[in-house]
Amino acid sequence: MKNLILIFIAALFIGCTSTGVQVTFDDEKSNALKEAYVKYLDQTFDGDIWSEDLQFYGNSTEPIGYDEAISLIGAQHELYDDISMSWGDGEEVSEIAFIQTINYPEYGYVSQAWFTWKGTGKFSGETVEIPCHIGYLWGEDGKIINEWQHSDQTHFNAEVALSLAAAE
């Protein structure tokens, strides 16, 4: 009888082992993204988290590559002052972003981030807050190989137009 109970308990523990999709929040990849966001805000982001073969989808089905993505990051700082990122409402803001990393056993690691991006246009003078969602697919080398950004780019496009008009 004791052996039967031991076998049952052992089977229970083995059966509870997670072998499917696993979601984590304070893991190496999620923390690497938080560090990259801090570098972005400090204007020291160097793209070291990205693979040189990066496919960057910014609200588009047509990707841009690594060099263009680096230029896009720089353009944001050329067009906006006082850039910040936050997750939460009102006084409950406690994180730069809400980030989770999911391990799909047959697909790989995917991270997702949600935050509110805020900045003041250098040409319009308008302060905007834009909800953002970004998905990241990690390669086997620990670098991001695909990035999908989802946000309303209306104000960004208008700010680009104002900057071009000012340059004429």
Show where each model-derived region lies.
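Positively charged n-region of N-terminal signal peptides that target proteins for export
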Residues: 1-4
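Short, intrinsically disordered, low-complexity terminal segments
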Residues: 7-8
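C-terminal motif of bacterial Sec signal peptides marking the signal peptidase cleavage site
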Residues: 12-15
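C-terminal and inter-domain tail/linker signature
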Residues: 17-168
